[in-house]
Amino acid sequence: DTDSDGDGIPDSVERGTGSAIADTDGDGTSDYLDLDSDGDGITDAIEKGPNGATPLDSDNDGIPNFRDVDSDADGIPDSIEGTTDTDTDGTPNYLDTDSDGDGISDSIEKGPNPLSPIDTDLDGTPDYKDLDSDGDGITDAIEGAIDTDGDGVPNYRDLDSDGDGIPDVTEGTTDTDNDNIPNYKDLDSDGDGISDATEGTLDTDGDGTPDYKDLDSDGDGISDAIEGTRDTDGDGTPDYLDL
């Protein structure tokens, strides 16, 4: 029999080179008799690809997938990624360097321990398979791996990407002042010259628009940009909030 285990890979390929017969996963069963030569939970019949005589080597590391415990070299073992195709792009996760298709590679999203990939929002879906890793309502594809506030946490994992004290889930992707910077990354969302960190989410005039998005926070007819943060009458209330 030229294919003793019937996995579609000829014994001549699976036996390996030299006098020693290959047993990749060290389970005591030689590869040519082992339906899962690398013991990653994905059968050789799947990993070999369309031509068993020349099995696939997806990451071009010289180790064919059926013997490679990390076929796409993203740092996450095939045994963890499996054959699921999270982003339905036709490439199973164990071969996909961006399993969720959010534009952030699995090698980044996995975190420091590939055996226990990071799950930022603790929703049971690890970041490399989660389209909204921090659960703030803004997709990772939009937030990206940049770190707007320089706090060491990339936006896709940061609940307050601009560090203004107002959560991204509150600010959202609206661009109040039309400066091409969405509010969740804008330190002055309404462009009135008073930072969001100062204005906060209070709605001083009760008009339904929080101060950080309100050009006239106290509703006195004078814009916040004119009134500013000075306290003309010294009563402890800045002019932009003082009637």
Language model features: what each stretch is:
Residues 1-243:
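Extracellular calcium-associated, cysteine-rich motifs in secreted modular proteins
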